[in-house]
Amino acid sequence: FSFNTLNLRLGKATGDTLNSAIRAKIEELKSEDRIGTMQFFKCTLVMVEEVGGKDIPFSAITVEWLQKCEKLWSKTRSVSTIGMHMRNIRTLMNEAKRAGVIKESQYPFGKGLFEIKTSIGRKKGLTKKQLKAIFDYKSENETTNRYKDLWIFIYLCNGINPTDMLKLKFSDIVDGEICFVRQKTERTTKNRKEIRATISVQMQAVIDKWGNKPLSDNYIFPYMKGNETAIEAKAITRDVVKRINKRMKLIGEELGIGNITTYTARHSYATV
């Protein structure tokens, strides 16, 4: 993303506004199939326009203006959500500063200026005892068992992101290990790292019960076809996560554990 790209895409007549910069960023992310981030920047655009309208010059982005945003947004949004949108704004302000659109003295973020608040997140990992209760849990409802098993697979497969799980193919299995690169890091050479997860007996049981036929070109799980657009794939993933979370919430309540989500599985892998 650059302001040269912005000017070419939107034309200099639009002027240097936060709105046009966000729209350019959205187009860039869409072209890179980074749909989740694209949708988040769309939300940022809606939120800043709630406060400043459709034509917000970069010169208007002051400490006071950001404080006004924070105060308004805090009525309906969490500290962590506000923080993520503020970081989107900061990203574009950094680009504006580098491009000479704003002066250093106009930059509103930093110590003694506007500081983005961070929430103190409670730990969402489960204990070994709680995990055992989930593993041992059996329902009379087949759908509940299906999504519980997918949750277990996420946990056992190194806390795999559901996006990555649904893209796994049988060709990703090499010598008893599942090998994959996290979607969030595959575009960067610096952080790009292949993850290997040994297929345990329990993981294999989940694959055998709920997976596709074990052919090299097949996805392991029957959700993606391979011809989806990035937006369609994102929608499928969101739907599967929603279904897992719905069933795991019921299981958590029944076991007295509380709300359980796919994030709980991922965090538990990292902490247990």
Task: Label the predicted regions.
Residues 119-120, 204-246:
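Major-groove DNA-contacting interfaces characterized by cationic-aromatic clusters
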Residues 23-36, 45-122, 136-137:
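N-terminal core-binding DNA-recognition domain of tyrosine recombinases/integrases
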Residues 242-272:
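Short, basic (Lys/Arg/His-rich) helix/loop patches that form interaction surfaces
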Residues 83, 106-162, 166:
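Basic, Lys/Arg- and aromatic-enriched nucleic-acid-binding interface segment
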Residues 111-112, 167-209:
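Conserved tyrosine-mediated DNA breakage-rejoining catalytic core shared by Y-recombinases
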Residues 66, 89, 153-154, 158, ...:
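Short, basic/aromatic-rich helical patch in the C-terminal catalytic core of site-specific tyrosine
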